[in-house]
Amino acid sequence: LDMGHMVNAIGQIDEFVNLGANSIETDVSFDSSANPEYTYHGIPCDCGRNCKKWENFNDFLKGLRSATTPGNSKYKEKLVLVVFDLKTGSLYDNQANDAGKKLAKNLLQHYWNNGNNGGRAYIVLSIPDLNHYPLIKGFTDTLKQEGHPELLDKLGYDFSGNDAIGDVAKAYKKAGVSGHVWQSDGITNCLLRGLTRVKEAVANRDSGNGYINKVYYWTVDKRATTRDALDAGVDGIMTNYPDVITDVLNEAAYKSKFRVATYEDNPWETFKK
């Protein structure tokens, strides 16, 4: 996946997909009652980016639905997966379940159109704090209660805090999750981070008995770092410049080993070499 980073305004969906992104990441902020409120990052954010673009969450969902519904005039066939970077740091731990419920209701109504020809993209819920694992159950229970368990097929999970791999595995156990796991690793583009933990995550993915299905690395804006990440065997790279990732994927060394994922690829299935 060529993952466009910090896509928080509806107009940016087109912008990033046109540069080659087949996936986007969107920030979700919550109000004090655990309602998803805005698609907003705020200051500080990545170097060289405007941190302040935003929409009301439900408006963004409607724009995203248009971009991922075949037949819609705004439809972008290439856009297959969306990561919601859930900014739950503003919430108390005991609000995590509620946040999941409210998030699910919003997506069900405004993105999935209550199961009636809604958006088709796969959705990854990315949670920054292992203690907020009840958000997952809040979300999945709500989809079941509302009569749409089939949408769980479209749903994946990520803990984005760069925690020890063993601790992340425990959090998933508590959450009752087995499968559909993307493991992120990374840091803002203003700083450097090695690939030690990425390689650990890739090893877990390829071990046959690990919890990880896919690994992505963020935020990569340079060709050299892109090559290093691909050499380490990642499944996705999050970037402010999707065209940089596209360029590297077109280099002779990578063209034969990697291709950009399409909707027909299963994002929950570990790729066997």
From Swiss-Prot:
Role: Dermonecrotic toxins cleave the phosphodiester linkage between the phosphate and headgroup of certain phospholipids (sphingolipid and lysolipid substrates), forming an alcohol (often choline) and a cyclic phosphate. This toxin acts on sphingomyelin (SM). It may also act on ceramide phosphoethanolamine (CPE), lysophosphatidylcholine (LPC) and lysophosphatidylethanolamine (LPE), but not on lysophosphatidylserine (LPS), and lysophosphatidylglycerol (LPG). It acts by transphosphatidylation, releasing exclusively cyclic phosphate products as second products.
MF GO annotations: lyase activity; metal ion binding; phosphoric diester hydrolase activity; toxin activity
BP-aspect Gene Ontology terms: killing of cells of another organism; lipid catabolic process
Localization in the cell: Secreted
InterPro entries: PLC-like_Pdiesterase_TIM-brl
E.C. number(s) listed in UniProt: 4.6.1.-
UniProt keyword list: Cytolysis, Dermonecrotic toxin, Disulfide bond, Hemolysis, Lipid degradation, Lipid metabolism, Lyase, Magnesium, Metal-binding, Secreted, Toxin
Cofactor: Mg(2+)
Protein name: Dermonecrotic toxin LhSicTox-alphaIA1i
Tissue specificity: Expressed by the venom gland.
UniProt family annotation: Belongs to the arthropod phospholipase D family. Class II subfamily.
Catalytic activity: an N-(acyl)-sphingosylphosphocholine = an N-(acyl)-sphingosyl-1,3-cyclic phosphate + choline; an N-(acyl)-sphingosylphosphoethanolamine = an N-(acyl)-sphingosyl-1,3-cyclic phosphate + ethanolamine; a 1-acyl-sn-glycero-3-phosphocholine = a 1-acyl-sn-glycero-2,3-cyclic phosphate + choline; a 1-acyl-sn-glycero-3-phosphoethanolamine = a 1-acyl-sn-glycero-2,3-cyclic phosphate + ethanolamine
Bridged cysteine pairs (disulfide): C45-C51, C47-C190
Amino-acid positions noted as binding Mg(2+) in the UniProt annotation, renumbered to this chain: E25, D27, D85
Active site residues of this protein: H5, H41 (nucleophile)
Pfam families (alphabetical): GDPD_2 (PF13653)
A GO CC annotation given for this chain: extracellular region
Predominant place of localization: secreted
Gene3D superfamilies: Phosphatidylinositol (PI) phosphodiesterase
Cofactor note: Binds 1 Mg(2+) ion per subunit.
